[in-house]
Amino acid sequence: MRLPDSCVRGTAVPAFAAWCGLFVVVALGPCRAHGEPPQPNGTIAGHPALAGSPRHTTTAQGRQGDAVNVALIGSEEELHQALAVAGWYAADPITLETSLRIAADCVLHKPYAHAPVSDLYVWGRKQDAAFEQPVGDSPKQRHHVRFWRSRELDRSGRPLWLGAATFDERVEISRTTGGITHRISPTIDSERNKLLGDAINARALDGYYWVEQFHRQRDGRNGGGDPYFTDRRLAVGVIDLRR
């Protein structure tokens, strides 16, 4: 279920404060029919890995890639469980077999819920995990997100999973590399909100908050030359599967 943008609010905190204080966390529960936001019910400490965290991914060639727009706090097992109950599929690794399959399934209009995603880089390494939700009858269109695990842990010993969520609109020839690639939708905030909304409705989060002005600019282009625009915020969710 896609959560209305008006329902994904949480508590806003300045970027400089996101790693050094205590903030009100939004209590979680299914979004009401008219988009009423949930009410705050507690506090959490900002994660130390947010201090100086990258704002964008990079490509293997060093170009600026997709914008970072979401983060989750929890163990690797919790991350996979939370995304699974929220209806997202783990992406297969890139191999010759999976590369041939995604190409064939795009042409033949066959579903591939675990289709691989291309590598992007944060903290000098490719994504540690990637998830997707297919749309239609082939991998041409899909919601997807990549995550990178922080080396720093919070006071509870949990890493931050920094993520970039986008929607693949179609397959095309890249304007920058000349290779076959997906073109992303420019409305990256909607993908961030969808991911957060899916996790909320699956009762996989304990709370979330916004880091305001995480990005300096409201628009940009990714490594494939695709334009995007954003409200400049980062959504940070705290995983709790005991709810």
PLM regions and their residue ranges:
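Primarily extracytoplasmic ectodomains and periplasmic/lumenal surface modules that are beta-strand-rich
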Residues: S75-P93, E97
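A cross-kingdom signal targeting lumenal/periplasmic-facing segments of multi-pass membrane
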Residues: I94-R243
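Terminal, regulation- and interaction-focused segments at domain boundaries
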Residues: S53-Q81
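Envelope-exposed proteins and targeting segments
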Residues: D66-V68, A86, H143
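Compositionally biased P/S/T/G-rich terminal and signal peptide-adjacent segments
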Residues: E36-Q61
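Bacterial N-terminal signal peptides
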Residues: P14-G29
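N-terminal secretory signal peptides that target proteins for export/translocation
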Residues: M1-V13
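Sec/Tat signal peptide C-region and signal peptidase I cleavage site
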Residues: C31-H34
